[in-house]
Amino acid sequence: MNPSTLPAPPLAEVYDVAVIGGGINGVGIAADAAGRGLSVFLCEKDDLASHTSSASSKLIHGGLRYLEHYEFRLVREALAEREVLLAKAPHIVKQMRFVLPHRPHLRPAWMIRAGLFLYDHLGKREKLAGSKSLKFGANSPLKSEITKGFEYSDCWVDDARLVVLNAMAAREKGAHIHTQTRCISAHRSNGLWEMNMERADGSLFSIRARALVNAAGPWVAKFIRDDLKLDSPYGIRLIQGSHLIVPRLYEGAHAHILQNEDQRIVFTIPYLNHLTIIGTTDREYTGDPAKVAITEGETDYMLKVVNAHFKKQLSRDDIVHTYSGVRPLCNDESDNPSAITRDYTLALSGGNGEAPILSVFGGKLTTYRKLAESAMAQLAPFFTQMRPSWTAKASLPGGENMTTPERAGRRHPRQIRLGTERDAPRRWATTYGSRTWRLLEGVQALADLGDHLGGGLYTREVDYLCAEEWATQPQDILWRRTKLGLFTTAEEQDNVQRYLSKVGQTRAKIEAA
């Protein structure tokens, strides 16, 4: 059936807000809007966080290097958001100290001290410790010629889970979240948006909405141009960022921020107890955002930066995994990809009887919540009964009544000490927080967790992720929601595929009966 011939749904199915895109900005806006009493529909053509939002450096940070580009508003907002997100989701956001080795020929010490002074004082800081100078001794993992440096605080986050938790928060406030669902066309009609949707199985349906939010990330301009047949108010620059994952590079829970000769920086970040993330790069990208992959040049670049700083030398043979994403930045005509603003721009059109559309250009993981508040402020004139902002103090799912993940492991020890792998209870706590008890509801013995598929993953957890977190494919579970893809064999990953296929066949038989 041609989308243009799809019948419009009855008026009872009109939503206040329809959101295109299941990345961090889309789900953040959906949650904010739903919590203000608006009816919300969100569609994502793939899985939640399946592109940019799961390919970040996994940091909640002010952006120390943005100070060099005079982005004081963005840095101030991001610094304040660190503490907000620490309180909202303590199971997936944690404090982290960052060590900055001093290389005098790149940036003088006074410049770094001035930047760190601003970093300490621009934003509200209660939980995070301030910066200080360091001297490195013989036990330092850094090369012997690097004798001094600095240390400051930022935060680490499980980026994909941050997206999923916001989607769950939106659903718990009444939003309808549809993954594997693509908006194939939309047009204005009688003061509403009429939107045509296609599910992964090819089935079609339509909805109507009073306002449309385009949070399609790398596809934001393409959606306006190709699916809405309108002109995009801004251009988009796709900047590729790639990362390496290697075995743990050094002891300790601190990250390093490494200065390079080209004035860029590269992070080394402790990851999942046994690994280190290295990244990121900045390069223009012109291909399909869904097919981005690390280049040979990026790999060599990051290895060279790390090997210039650390005693332990890395080669390609040390690489466990790589991942890449594209950052959809608002085109500010900068010649240097690293200098393009990471701030967001919201473009609103409509009014005077014409249904509004709000498009999101740019943005960064750290400031998604403030972006959502700004989006709702722009839409407020169209929804005069909308309730006030609410997300600053509200916990995300799993963060309720928690201060640290360790609390989850102490609350009901009988429930999680089941003879499973030693790391399983802590992994559950740092993945699901206080929602671990929903995962383990009724579990009294190891057998209640179902079959072991590999890497500490049991069928009970797979069932939970499918029922509660929109997981449908092995990669949704292994790479975005649990990260167990890094610790499972190809055969074990096939076990997950076989189990999902079996469950799907059983469900299909029940529905057909």
Curated annotation (Swiss-Prot):
<protein>
    <recommendedName>
        <fullName>Glycerol-3-phosphate dehydrogenase</fullName>
        <ecNumber>1.1.5.3</ecNumber>
    </recommendedName>
</protein>
<dbReference type="InterPro" id="IPR036188">
    <property type="entry name" value="FAD/NAD-bd_sf"/>
</dbReference>
<dbReference type="GO" id="GO:0005737">
    <property type="term" value="C:cytoplasm"/>
</dbReference>
<dbReference type="GO" id="GO:0006071">
    <property type="term" value="P:glycerol metabolic process"/>
</dbReference>
<comment type="similarity">
    <text>Belongs to the FAD-dependent glycerol-3-phosphate dehydrogenase family.</text>
</comment>
<dbReference type="Pfam" id="PF01266">
    <property type="entry name" value="DAO"/>
</dbReference>
<dbReference type="InterPro" id="IPR038299">
    <property type="entry name" value="DAO_C_sf"/>
</dbReference>
<keyword id="KW-0963">Cytoplasm</keyword>
<dbReference type="InterPro" id="IPR006076">
    <property type="entry name" value="FAD-dep_OxRdtase"/>
</dbReference>
<keyword id="KW-0274">FAD</keyword>
<dbReference type="GO" id="GO:0004368">
    <property type="term" value="F:glycerol-3-phosphate dehydrogenase (quinone) activity"/>
</dbReference>
<dbReference type="Pfam" id="PF16901">
    <property type="entry name" value="DAO_C"/>
</dbReference>
<feature type="binding site">
    <location>
        <begin position="16"/>
        <end position="44"/>
    </location>
    <ligand>
        <name>FAD</name>
    </ligand>
</feature>
<keyword id="KW-0560">Oxidoreductase</keyword>
<dbReference type="GO" id="GO:0046168">
    <property type="term" value="P:glycerol-3-phosphate catabolic process"/>
</dbReference>
<keyword id="KW-0319">Glycerol metabolism</keyword>
<keyword id="KW-0285">Flavoprotein</keyword>
<dbReference type="InterPro" id="IPR031656">
    <property type="entry name" value="DAO_C"/>
</dbReference>
<dbReference type="InterPro" id="IPR000447">
    <property type="entry name" value="G3P_DH_FAD-dep"/>
</dbReference>
